[in-house]
């Protein structure tokens, strides 16, 4: 469960209905890498998505809530850090594996969800 997730979704512009879906969706994330090339797959009862990208290189991403963003992934220690930019906004999503689960911290402006 993520503290402050609804506030984060509001801050990035997600409407009420999508926030309700987002608050109960528990996606499975699979990350695989070969050198700097990474494949990230999410599966859930709501939507399945896949992104292929090279670390440090910006690419066009369509998010699960249909935002069109410019995204860049980098590695910072044991974290996979994603920066999304769209319509003058910017959000950072930091993902770290702890045991058999992933901990994600999302931020936009002064709104932080962990």
Swiss-Prot record:
Modification note: The N-terminus is blocked.
Gene3D superfamilies assigned: 2.40.128.20
Highest taxon of the lineage: Eukaryota
Major subcellular site: cytoplasm
Record Pfam families: Lipocalin
MF-aspect GO terms: lipid binding
Gene Ontology cellular-component terms listed: cytoplasm
Location relative to the cell: Cytoplasm
Keyword Transport: yes
Keyword field: Cytoplasm, Lipid-binding, Transport
Keyword Cytoplasm annotated: yes
PANTHER family, A to Z: FATTY ACID BINDING PROTEIN
Function comment: FABPs are thought to play a role in the intracellular transport of long-chain fatty acids and their acyl-CoA esters.
Family: Belongs to the calycin superfamily. Fatty-acid binding protein (FABP) family.
Record remark: domains: Forms a beta-barrel structure that accommodates hydrophobic ligands in its interior.
UniProt protein name: Fatty acid-binding protein, liver
